[in-house]
């Protein structure tokens, strides 16, 4: 599950893309409950029937909106991971992109809704959702392999460690987006930073990091 929503910086020329951008903006500004085909039509100057022509169902609209937003964030993630800085610094950047900004983060709100609807989805839809998850997983695995090969990280099974790390991020991220009392983003970042230090690095950095608040 990815991080906070970011507005696209390029001009949107295709009608389908305009609808997806408008859907994400509606979720960010008004919440998922206010997202309707008729409302989107008014935003982009189309009839609800025209929008149904592109998407068919609201479930499909939500999934395509999620895919579109992940394309935007994926470009940002790849840019962050290609920087010429230590692997640990790039790992922190990936974590920052992954986590929600906080309560009711629109991208995470959309993720949770798509996850919930996937309980009754067909196999093809679930595969499309899995592809979004695996994009993060592959980038995390590649970064771990690089860090181990350069001696920046302890030797770990990159696939297993990436799976466990994403589960940790998903758990903390869910706490943040639902507004679990006593949970804030900086506290979560400290918890995750301690886990990564203890698991991947040795030496004074891990020992010197102040403990996370309970």
Write out the residue ranges for each language-model feature.
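N-terminal intrinsically disordered/low-complexity leader segments
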Residues: 1-14, 204-214
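Helix-turn-helix
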Residues: 15-18, 22-60, 64
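Short coil/turn segments at alpha/beta junctions that flank glycine-rich nucleotide-binding fingerprints
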Residues: 29-33, 84, 150
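Hydrophobic alpha-helical connector segments
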Residues: 64, 78-108, 161-165, 189, ...
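Short, basic, alpha-helical segments at the C-terminal edge of helix-turn-helix-like DNA-binding modules
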Residues: 67-73
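Amphipathic alpha-helical packing segments from all-alpha helical-bundle domains
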Residues: 74-75, 79, 104-112, 123-149, ...
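Helix-loop "lid/cap" segments that line or gate small-molecule binding pockets
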Residues: 80-81, 96-102, 110-120, 195-199
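Hydrophobic/aromatic-rich alpha-helical bundle segments in the mid-to-C-terminal region
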Residues: 125-130, 134, 148-196, 203-214
């Amino acid at each position: 599950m990815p991080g906070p929503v970011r507005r696209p910086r390029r001009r949107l020329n295709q009608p389908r893309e305009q609808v997806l951008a408008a859907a994400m903006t509606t979720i960010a500004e008004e919440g998922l409950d206010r997202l309707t085909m008729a409302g989107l039509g008014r935003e982009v100057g189309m009839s609800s029937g025209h929008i149904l022509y592109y998407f068919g169902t609201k479930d499909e609209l939500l999934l395509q909106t999620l895919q579109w937003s992940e394309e935007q964030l994926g470009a940002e993630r790849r840019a962050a991971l290609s920087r010429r800085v230590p692997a640990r610094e790039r790992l922190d950047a990936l974590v920052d992109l992954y986590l929600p900004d906080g309560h009711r983060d629109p991208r995470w709100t959309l993720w949770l809704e798509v996850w919930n609807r996937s309980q009754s989805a067909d196999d093809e839809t679930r595969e499309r959702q899995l592809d979004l998850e695996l994009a993060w997983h592959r980038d995390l695995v590649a970064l771990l392999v690089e860090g181990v090969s350069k001696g920046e990280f302890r030797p770990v099974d990159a696939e297993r460690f990436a799976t466990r790390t994403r589960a940790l991020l998903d758990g903390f991220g869910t706490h943040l987006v639902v507004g679990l009392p006593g949970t804030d983003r900086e506290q979560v970042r400290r918890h995750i930073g301690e886990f990564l230090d203890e698991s991947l690095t040795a030496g004074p950095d891990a020992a010197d990091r102040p403990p996370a608040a309970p």
